């Protein structure tokens, strides 16, 4: 018998904010996920180097997890000295959790660029994909992504409990137009980040003097 599925949310988290956390909370509640694992990247393959150090980003992720029941921090990617490829993390987790469905959480922007990911066609061998979709948005799917959805999309949340991997579930979420880039701009301008990220994270940023304008 399979255990309850868990959610996996990777990212640079520079800093972690409600645009990361709110969709994860929604997915946890909609799918009955046993936990959400926050997995900070060390060297993100598709992004520029982070503004903050790994230690600072980890500290912020720990603070955010402490404020959200059922959220835990997985540090494995920070301990690598090579790019943080999702497939490597999923393969390691599958070996550790052979009876637990894995739900990898991502935004629609990530799904649309999935064919550029390292070994992207193998991801669904190890996890389900849970994709945050802005209500009313009808994306123009690239051919490879459209074909992937045709084979793997489900609207049955319980299906993610019955199989270890292989489904794609599109989650309707509250529209949150916030990116880490925009948040860093607000912080650099000295604006109040209240309600855009956990209070403990905002306090840490202020105490450490992070994201200030040069």
From Swiss-Prot:
Q: Which residues form the signal peptide?
A: none
Q: What is its EC number?
A: 2.7.7.18
Q: What class of enzyme is it?
A: transferase
Q: Write out the entry's keywords from A to Z.
A: ATP-binding, NAD, Nucleotide-binding, Nucleotidyltransferase, Pyridine nucleotide biosynthesis, Transferase
Q: Which domain of life is it from?
A: Bacteria
Role? Catalyzes the reversible adenylation of nicotinate mononucleotide (NaMN) to nicotinic acid adenine dinucleotide (NaAD).
Protein name, as recorded = Probable nicotinate-nucleotide adenylyltransferase
Q: Which gene encodes it?
A: nadD
């Amino acid at each position: 018998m399979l255990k309850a599925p868990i959610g996996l949310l990777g990212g640079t988290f520079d800093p972690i904010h409600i645009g990361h956390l709110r969709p994860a909370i929604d997915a946890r509640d909609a799918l009955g996920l046993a936990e959400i694992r926050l997995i900070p990247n060390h060297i993100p393959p598709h992004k520029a180097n982070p503004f903050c150090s790994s230690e600072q980003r980890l500290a912020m992720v720990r603070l955010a997890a402490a404020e959200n029941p059922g959220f835990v921090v997985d540090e494995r990617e920070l301990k690598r000295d090579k790019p943080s490829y999702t497939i490597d993390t999923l393969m390691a987790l599958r070996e550790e959790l052979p009876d637990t469905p894995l739900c990898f959480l991502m935004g629609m922007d990530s799904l649309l660029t999935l064919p550029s990911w390292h070994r992207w066609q193998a991801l669904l061998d190890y996890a389900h994909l849970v994709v945050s979709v802005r209500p009313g948005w009808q994306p123009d799917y690239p051919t490879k992504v459209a074909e992937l959805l045709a084979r793997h999309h489900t609207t049955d949340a319980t299906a993610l409990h019955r199989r270890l991997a292989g489904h794609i579930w599109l989650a309707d979420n509250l529209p949150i137009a916030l990116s880490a880039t925009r948040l860093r701009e607000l912080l650099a301008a000295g604006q109040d980040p209240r309600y855009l990220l956990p209070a403990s994270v905002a306090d840490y940023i202020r105490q450490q003097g992070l994201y200030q304008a040069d």
